[in-house]
Amino acid sequence: MTIKESWLLPEGIDELLPQEASQLECLHRSLVDRMRSWGYQLVVPPLVEYLDSLLTGTAKTLDIQTFKLTDQMSGRMLGIRADMTPQVARIAAHKLRNQAEILRLCYIGSVLHTLPQGQGTSRNPIQLGAEIYGHAGPESDVESIEMMADLLHVTGAVSEIALDIGHVGIYRGLAEYAGLTSEQEEALFSALQRKAAAEIDALLDNFKLDDDAHQMLQALAELNGDRSVLEQASTKLAQAPESVKEALATLSTISEMLSQRLPELVINLDLAELRGYHYHTGVVFAAYKPGSAQAIAAGGRYDDIGEHFGHAQPATGFSLDLKMIATLLPVIEDEKAEVIGVEWDSDPALLETVSSLRDAGKVVIYQMPGAAITTSHTLVKQAGHWQVTETGTQTRG
């Protein structure tokens, strides 16, 4: 590698300079404090784990996104986490299983992806999230959405939030009712995610399903909009199995609760919203800035994962990329905060004064010998005492 190339970072890997890092740290502190005010306890999972543990109960996409390496101590395969959610589920199921009937945990940390998850996205995002364990009802889903919206407002990155909400049980139940093979289910899933109407029609024609199954699966791509979508769904999916009707009832309950608790929230019901289809088990949701196609936070219910760690329990939650949120904020110019400079000196009285100033939250830096004074204020000895004065106005004594 040449000198010219030695400073290059891998594609999709970024770093934060002081101003960006300061802004991100402020976000970090304010959001963790906010989650604690909701009763969520912070946990810090490790950056790497044994691969089989890291991928337990997760979708194939997470396996693809995970960097893998060999542990030089045990010879076993390790994975660098690409998502902290399974790690927190492991902690909840194994280490904290007897702590509370309903457990609320939050987390923040760097993750690493083998490939970017979207155009222009970072491969080393900082993931922040929160999970509720031990409650299967719509109330915990609503709490997750409500807190997600609260955190987004706290960041100042958005003034208005558009929420897409769906339920993976609808498509799953219809696919089972239609008797789709796993290959057919995957192909139709892909087309539904892209809202590719012509492809959906061609696939359904090729599957040769009975009329009811064909029409209900065809209707999914069109069933999105405000709460009136649920009324349309009750008609168009009238022949659906009970599991689908239960999923629709859950969506109705959740959307009603959200309308009461967050009347300013713009809610879009999308019955073909299948984000995390192979991982989630119920409601799925994503938050957007109105007019943007890029989700700024997302989550859903995943009731099965705890079983893989020996303690089955319902769970729901959400996560976001703190780096991406920071890009939505205006650049904050460095405040011209008072910085106090002092010449290098080992006077005990000076050292005590510097310590007291720092305890009071002041910024004090030592001027290295030969370096120019660049601070707004200077600590000088006047009448036998160390005093803070504006640079250029001091007199020694």
Predicted regions located by residue number:
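Acidic, His- and aromatic-enriched active-site or binding-groove loops in soluble protein domains
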Residues: 65-73, 179-202, 209
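Positively charged, Gly/Ser-enriched RNA/tRNA-binding surfaces
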Residues: 20, 26-37, 50, 85-96, ...
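Extended alpha-helical scaffolds
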Residues: 155-158, 162-175, 182-184, 198
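A structural signal for short, well-ordered beta-strand segments and their strand-loop junctions
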Residues: 42-45, 107, 162-166, 268-270
